[in-house]
């Protein structure tokens, strides 16, 4: 009985309570996460209660949060009402997502000034991932606050035990000399992004240095396709993971270097606006053979000269990605 009485008193207090104190601060805080967008405005803007404000004019999902009204777009993919009227467009190489918080009172007369808090989140589509990877595990996921977001922190390169790409090899990844020519399975994966975004590998190459622009390099993937027939691209642009395999190799005539660094230009593709899967014409892929030994062209941009090195240690094709370095003994 006491509990019921207290509950009724709370209801009556709310019923007779006056409107909130108007706040005329034109401020909006925007947090652009890889999958979610959160916005905050000062509570009681120009006298409006939180239940009178709608995200995109659709979602009345505002909550009180320490002096602010907070609104959330839980997923950047338009499904049901979770998208909350968010609009998007692609202006190469940036994705733009924009929406607004608007007043939407259904009463006969309105005494508060209408409000419209517009906001935008932008995300780059292209990333060059080239960190040393064999001594580093999956990249730590973090986000950047503000009006500009990034997908880069969600990208990582993993090594797998076989072509099923189900079992990840632990770092550090070491290739023994006796394993030169053996299959290596790799995948660039994006975690925590909306399902609408697919991972596309544009170009992948290997260098004997951590510098992605090092003059000695070997191409693995060019314009989304395998550089030769010994490299197999399993998936590219179909899911949140792009996978491929190649034969382990080492660079010749490179003294005092035992590491191979991998680099990939990675594109995050919006499958709701574009066709993301990469289609390759195998007739355009060429492989040179001399006496059954593969010949690889390595550009050595030294004084404008270009030289060729012969890799006689078995199939010499590697080059993968996004900053993981294989230690070859």
UniProtKB/Swiss-Prot annotation:
Gene3D superfamilies, per the entry: Zona pellucida, ZP-C domain, Zona pellucida, ZP-N domain
Cellular localization per UniProt: Cell membrane; Secreted, Extracellular space, Extracellular matrix
Membrane topology type: Lipid-anchor; GPI-anchor
Pfam family, one: Zona_pellucida
One Gene Ontology cellular component annotation held by this UniProt entry: side of membrane
GO molecular function, one term: extracellular matrix structural constituent
PROSITE patterns, alphabetized: ZP_1, ZP_2
Sugar attachment sites: 80, 104, 116, 145
Coiled-coil intervals: none
Regions crossing the membrane: none
UniProt cross-references to InterPro entries, sorted A to Z: ZP-C, ZP-C_dom, ZP_dom, ZP_dom_CS
Protein's job: One of the major non-collagenous components of the tectorial membrane. The tectorial membrane is an extracellular matrix of the inner ear that covers the neuroepithelium of the cochlea and contacts the stereocilia bundles of specialized sensory hair cells. Sound induces movement of these hair cells relative to the tectorial membrane, deflects the stereocilia and leads to fluctuations in hair-cell membrane potential, transducing sound into electrical signals.
Domains (record comment): Zona pellucida domain may enable to form filaments.
Protein name as it appears in the record: Beta-tectorin
Organism (species): Gallus gallus (Chicken)
Biological classification of the source: Eukaryota, Metazoa, Chordata, Craniata, Vertebrata
Gene: TECTB
